[in-house]
């Protein structure tokens, strides 16, 4: 989180799992935003959108009414597995392609997602989730005091690590948490 890395810098290792968030964007003939996620929203004004991440990412890309966004995921929110960061990254990539016909780099994705979650929404989250979702694999990240993040892929070509990972198990405890309320 910024209050720590701005004083000390930081490091973290992330390991992504083979679970995904899917986002579909369609242009529609109505001057509305139709949003389908765990809820359904059908609004005319961007400021009426209840889902904060969707609202702010739409504002970031200056998307006007006439769009339908549908999302679903392999894992429910609140599992502690970085689903909001993964959703933010997926939505940013989908809207960049929709608006600009441009696929963003991993660095651009993680930077925009972090900006939306930390600076715009003021969520008490760190840089790890958007970066883990953007880069995938097993990564070592180094954060400077200025917030610059460098990544190093520590999985690629590491046979010992590959053997270790193939024997890991992920167990669903069915416990839920909200990182923004901790």
Task: Place the predicted regions along the sequence by residue.
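Anion-binding (especially nucleotide phosphate/pyrophosphate-binding) glycine-rich loop
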Residues: 18-116
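Short secondary-structure capping/turn segments at boundaries of alpha-helices and beta-strands
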Residues: 8-13, 20-24
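ATP-dependent small-molecule kinase catalytic core of the GHMP/sugar-kinase superfamily
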Residues: 2-12, 29-32, 97-182
């Amino acid at each position: 989180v910024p209050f720590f890395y701005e004083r000390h810098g930081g490091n973290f290792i992330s390991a992504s799992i083979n679970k995904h968030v899917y986002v579909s964007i369609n242009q529609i003939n109505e001057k509305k935003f139709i949003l389908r996620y765990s809820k359904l929203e059908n609004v005319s004004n961007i400021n009426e959108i209840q889902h904060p991440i969707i609202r702010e990412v739409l504002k970031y890309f200056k998307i006007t009414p006439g769009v339908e966004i549908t999302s679903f995921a392999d894992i429910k929110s609140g599992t502690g597995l970085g689903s909001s960061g993964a959703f933010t990254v997926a939505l940013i990539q989908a809207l960049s392609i929709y608006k600009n016909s441009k696929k963003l780099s991993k660095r651009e994705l993680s930077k925009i997602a972090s900006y939306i979650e930390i600076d715009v929404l003021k969520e008490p989250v760190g840089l790890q989730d958007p970066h883990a979702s953007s880069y995938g694999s097993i990564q070592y990240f180094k954060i400077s005091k200025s917030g610059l993040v460098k990544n190093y892929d520590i999985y690629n070509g590491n046979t010992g690590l590959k053997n270790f990972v193939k024997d890991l198990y992920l167990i669903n405890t069915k416990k839920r948490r909200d990182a923004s309320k901790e």
